[in-house]
Amino acid sequence: MINRKILLTSLLLIFTVLSACSREKNTCRVVKISDGDTLTCLTKGNKSIKVRLAEIDAPEKSQAFGQKSKKTLSDLVYQKNVRLARKGKDRYQRTLAVVYYQKQNINLEMVKQGMAWAYKQYSHDPIYLQAQENAQAKGIGLWADNNPIEPSQWRRQEKINMAFDYQTFPSSISLFPT
């Protein structure tokens, strides 16, 4: 009986220590806002982490509502200690995470305020789509625009525009030499 109590107490202590270490590892201070869905934070050991907010896609900086989205994220978390619920890495090796400030889901808050879309391609939680539908119905944030363009569509169009701009292509250069 005593051995069992010692074992249970030991296991409880180990899990408590591991939990505390995990919380500390996932806590950081936001030191930079890149745009409405990307931030940089520092851990207690001064390790820099670039974080891409999971489940959402915010307008690009040069897109309509891009600067407002960036400012909204800044107002919510800049210079604040946040907790990261990590989801892995994206193709640019940024940490994908749900960001929490004082138990508030910041990713979800960005969608609620109409400053980001639920990222349908990568979203696994229906609360983001519900929040988007609510913001859209109320005309909040980017939903006040007559024709809001999803960032993924906007990026595709920008690539096409940059790939070949007939307006600026020099007329002295022949595309089809004879």
From Swiss-Prot:
Signal sequence annotation: 1-19
Record Pfam families: SNase
Organism of derivation: Haemophilus influenzae (strain ATCC 51907 / DSM 11121 / KW20 / Rd)
Positions of transmembrane segments: none
Domain of life per record: Bacteria
Stated name of the protein: Uncharacterized endonuclease HI_1296
A molecular-function term among this protein's GO annotations: endonuclease activity
Classification via InterPro entries: SNase_OB-fold_sf, Staphylococal_nuclease_OB-fold, Thermonucl_AS
Active site: R52, E60, R94
Family: Belongs to the thermonuclease family.
